[in-house]
From Swiss-Prot:
Keywords: Cell membrane, Cell projection, Cilium, G-protein coupled receptor, Glycoprotein, Membrane, Receptor, Sensory transduction, Taste, Transducer, Transmembrane, Transmembrane helix. This is Taste receptor type 2 member 4. Several bitter taste receptors are expressed in a single taste receptor cell. Pfam families: TAS2R. CDD domains: 7tm_TAS2R4 (cd15013). The chain crosses the membrane at residues 12-32, 47-67, 81-101, 129-149, 172-192, 230-250, 261-281. It comes from Mus musculus. It is a multi-pass membrane protein. Expressed in subsets of taste receptor cells of the tongue and palate epithelium and exclusively in gustducin-positive cells. Expressed in 15% taste bud cells in circumvallate and foliate papillae but only in 2% in fungiform papillae. It comes from the Eukaryota. One of its GO terms (molecular function) is taste receptor activity.
Amino acid sequence: MLWELYVFVFAASVFLNFVGIIANLFIIVIIIKTWVNSRRIASPDRILFSLAITRFLTLGLFLLNSVYIATNTGRSVYFSTFFLLCWKFLDANSLWLVTILNSLYCVKITNFQHPVFLLLKRTISMKTTSLLLACLLISALTTLLYYMLSQISRFPEHIIGRNDTSFDLSDGILTLVASLVLNSLLQFMLNVTFASLLIHSLRRHIQKMQRNRTSFWNPQTEAHMGAMRLMICFLVLYIPYSIATLLYLPSYMRKNLRAQAICMIITAAYPPGHSVLLIITHHKLKAKAKKIFCFYK
């Protein structure tokens, strides 16, 4: 029974990978065509383009790993380490890109008057390139910390130096673990905060429209509703994903196949699910997707 559950989850994960690869490839192609035609690219589309490329590479890497698992092909320890480090880097980069995208949506749509919020509103659009580079640097640093932690944990707890001095490695391990946890916690807090602020602001705007009989439903309001639905669905996918990612790491979870299967399906559902949501709520991507579906009907 447990083996059948694992096979089902594995097959579902591969299917979700295919969906995510197609969705992100669609985003990449449409944004490139728009970029070539208009000779310019907006800040949200630039971030979305970077996110789609990162997720395309991440899901492609997972698909390659699934092929290795399904065919029982032997691979060296170095290949496994390289695969894991690539996944850590791409996953961290995609999460930071999502954080920037959520912050951009939040400052563009909401109208809070807090000084910090106003500062973000003035600078975030102009600093898009710098923020994208910062995502790469932070992701590389996080991956390096993870690699250092994995290497240190292989050694004994105490190492004797040349002068017979005993070095306790627990302090170094705790420092690295704290750095990784703080990085994930910062991402989680920022994403939940930006999404919650946007949902709260849009809900107040819609309630105000309902009280004002003279207001009418316009394309801008429709875009705001799309952003609100996007953030609600994002939280539904992102919060379980963050919890499952943390629970998937401890060794006792690896021994529990049921818990491992649940974490695997949750982590596999988030990237393609969020990519599809981005297509549905983006007016250009949604229009192109409708044309493609109507053509093949």
